[in-house]
């Protein structure tokens, strides 16, 4: 083979190899592009799933909050109270820090309903709830227990200090300016307070506070008693 023929043969071979390399690079680039598209699609799906999960979790939290809230007063309801009481009771059993409970009942509430109607009664409940909630300490927990009755949980608070807190609530509620149908309506409450003691169950301390409440009622209402 002469030199010219050899050059031509080598040139053809190089062209063939170059073409093969170009086709390989093209296919490789196409594969990379396809993989990038698939990865992008997967990332979008994961992001959509995460967003949906967050929405569902937020909805569950909202539904739970609604289930734990009294619609009229916007305070925690009895179910929320039972959950929080169980938590604080377990904490008290472990650390033995002071823990007190108060049961609060609006005085002569039936008379308010009978005299002014249920709208007035509802408004009284809302006013009392708002007033007490605004004066809660950061660790306290208040709930509407039912009807005109509220319950207050006071962690890190002994009996006398708890009575002082509830007494301040009583004084402020008694000063609430409330008129219905152009007539002034007096709002007061009676309350019982008790502190957890050795051997107490959740029901035991609640029963003592409830008993103290009725002692306050029997003694003339608009006062706080302890047991």
Where are these regions (language model features)?
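Conserved nucleotide-binding and Mg2+-coordinating catalytic segments in signaling enzymes
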Residues: 65-83, 104-118, 126
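Heptad-repeat coiled-coil signal-transmission/dimerization helices
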Residues: 81, 85-86, 102, 124-125, ...
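Nucleotide second-messenger and two-component phosphorelay signaling modules
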Residues: 87-100, 104, 115, 134-141, ...
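Hydrophobic framework residues that shape the active-site pocket
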Residues: 109, 128, 142-145, 150, ...
């Amino acid at each position: 083979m002469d030199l010219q023929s050899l050059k031509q043969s080598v040139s053809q071979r190089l062209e063939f190899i170059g073409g093969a390399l170009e086709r390989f690079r093209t296919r490789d680039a196409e594969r990379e592009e396809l993989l990038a598209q698939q990865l992008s699609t997967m990332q979008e799906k994961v992001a959509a799933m995460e967003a949906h999960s967050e929405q569902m979790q937020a909805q569950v939290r909202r539904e739970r909050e609604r289930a734990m809230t009294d619609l009229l007063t916007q305070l925690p309801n009895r179910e929320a109270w039972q959950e929080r009481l169980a938590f604080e009771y377990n904490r008290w059993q472990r650390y033995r820090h002071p823990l007190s409970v108060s049961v609060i009942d609006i005085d002569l509430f039936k008379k308010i309903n009978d005299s002014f109607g249920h709208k007035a009664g509802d408004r009284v409940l809302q006013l009392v709830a708002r007033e007490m909630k605004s004066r809660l300490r950061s660790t306290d927990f208040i709930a509407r227990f039912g009807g005109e009755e509220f319950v207050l949980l006071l962690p890190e608070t002994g009996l006398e200090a708890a009575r002082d807190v509830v007494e301040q609530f009583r004084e402020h509620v008694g000063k609430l300016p409330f008129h219905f149908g152009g007539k002034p309506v007096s709002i007061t409450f009676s309350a019982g307070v008790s502190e957890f003691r050795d051997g107490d169950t959740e029901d035991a301390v609640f029963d003592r506070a409830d008993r103290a409440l009725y002692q306050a009622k029997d003694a003339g209402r608009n006062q706080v008693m302890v047991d």
